């Protein structure tokens, strides 16, 4: 009987982790930088193609390591230039990655989990339940796949991917270690060299991990707000029952202050017809956010089957935006992109092998975000 050796997947290793790996196989640490450039700058997954690495080391690497990204199931291109990749991860589920071109800017929307346990009522991902956390290699692998697809070299003036947003499937802060590792690779010059201001993590509000985030990484923060009061947010975003608005906004302010720079919080607000789109909601929002440096991104709801919600009229959207503008807020309305390939905000579904029944998901959220578990999870990043 033979046993196969589990190889180290180098794709998800940060620079310190890669250096430690080369230490472990008796090689000099500078080799880490050489290999990382081949992997992330040039999309190479074949050690034999790494021509500035000695043949002896290449043979050693082939025996103990690999470069393995998620499997690309499909790639679709929208009429507006938006691209969507469906990729299969180790759990067997599929997740989605979306690229949105806009002038000289190209934004990649990356998933952090297969499915999501938060069960936000207007999100198609949440309707599927939760299957698994993605590994660091599966998170950064989405950037790697997209970059290879464009044949683009990171950190060059004409690179395709200029911004990354952790706004795909899943709640990034409930996959803390792997998401933080992947974001470090996004910003590392040996990785993708993206500015910290151009890497954004979006959260529905896992308060203890927002506080933990500033200890480990400096990235832009976006809050999925979607309601201006606790009663409504409890219905739309169930985790609000555990971390209500006052607690949540205070944690966001602590995060922004900890960065030590003049930074603003991005507020994401999905507009739902006759639910949260009335002028009184805008007035409540003004009062809620009046002391918080922020910019507001209004997202007209993108319908999906059996959602139970509708997109507001253009007039209703404009009135809501104008009310916020008049109060002095910087407000934009997100243009729907990639709708013809189901790549618009809130439409990402993949093919998730659901491990949670719908009635159990809020319990799962409470367990996932229990303070003791979160503290242990944070400690593991050290």
From Swiss-Prot:
Cofactor: [4Fe-4S] cluster
Cystine bridges: 109-345
The record's free-text note on cofactor binding: Binds 1 [4Fe-4S] cluster. The cluster is coordinated with 3 cysteines and an exchangeable S-adenosyl-L-methionine.
GO-annotated molecular function: 4 iron, 4 sulfur cluster binding; metal ion binding; rRNA (adenine(2503)-C2-)-methyltransferase activity; rRNA binding; tRNA (adenine(37)-C2)-methyltransferase activity; tRNA binding
Residue ranges occupied by any Radical SAM core domain in the UniProt entry: 102-342
Pfam families with a match to the protein in the record: Radical_SAM, RlmN_N
Binding site for S-adenosyl-L-methionine: 170-171, 202, 224-226, 302
Coiled coil: none
Annotated [4Fe-4S] cluster binding sites: 116, 120, 123
Chief place where the protein resides: cytoplasm
Entry's EC annotation: 2.1.1.192
Active site as annotated: 96 (proton acceptor), 345 (s-methylcysteine intermediate)
Biological function: Specifically methylates position 2 of adenine 2503 in 23S rRNA and position 2 of adenine 37 in tRNAs. m2A2503 modification seems to play a crucial role in the proofreading step occurring at the peptidyl transferase center and thus would serve to optimize ribosomal fidelity.
HAMAP family, alphabetized: RNA_methyltr_RlmN (MF_01849)
Similarity comment: Belongs to the radical SAM superfamily. RlmN family.
Further details from the record: Reaction proceeds by a ping-pong mechanism involving intermediate methylation of a conserved cysteine residue.
Name of the molecule in the record: Dual-specificity RNA methyltransferase RlmN
UniProt gene name: rlmN
